[in-house]
A protein has these predicted regions:
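An acidic, low-aromatic, low-complexity terminal/linker signal
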Residues: 1-139
Length: 139
């Protein structure tokens, strides 16, 4: 039995997970410098111990409903192909151990977040967790 550890988080009422091996750290409202004329989903850049990190508004990137910045917002710092990227999310959940056999492929006939950016879907007692494909989100 192979286990996958997910860092789960929320954007509005939507629950998502990222493979914990991709997560470097989670920051609470770091200072962010806006970048003029950047894409609408780019929040700006932050200084992470001397490293410049681009911060993405994950709600905007996934074309989900905008939620106002709040005290529960967090920035998940991920490592993708030796580059650090920050993903701003509404709130963080838990680290969820998942049997890989319980992860289903995303539906092939669906557009939107699950069709474009999910590498899998996990059914839970409370609904579905979309497991994000970090490389697809950053492409």
């Amino acid at each position: 039995m192979e286990l996958l550890l997910l860092a789960d988080f929320y954007i509005g009422d939507h629950q998502f997970g990222i493979n914990i091996l991709k997560v470097q750290e989670i920051n609470k409202n770091p200072p962010i410098t806006k970048v003029p004329q950047s894409q609408e989903f780019i929040v700006g850049v932050m200084n992470l111990r001397g490293r410049i990190v681009t911060v993405i508004d994950l709600a905007a990137k996934l074309r989900l409903e905008f939620t106002a910045p709040g005290r529960d917002n967090r920035t998940i710092i991920i490592n993708s192909q030796d580059e650090y990227i920050g993903l701003r999310v509404d709130r963080i959940g838990d680290v969820v151990p998942v049997k890989t056999a319980n992860v289903e492929p995303p539906p092939v006939n669906i557009d939107g977040v699950l069709g474009s950016f999910a590498e899998g879907v996990l059914k839970t007692d409370t609904g579905l967790i979309g497991i994000l494909d970090v490389e697809a989100v950053l492409a």
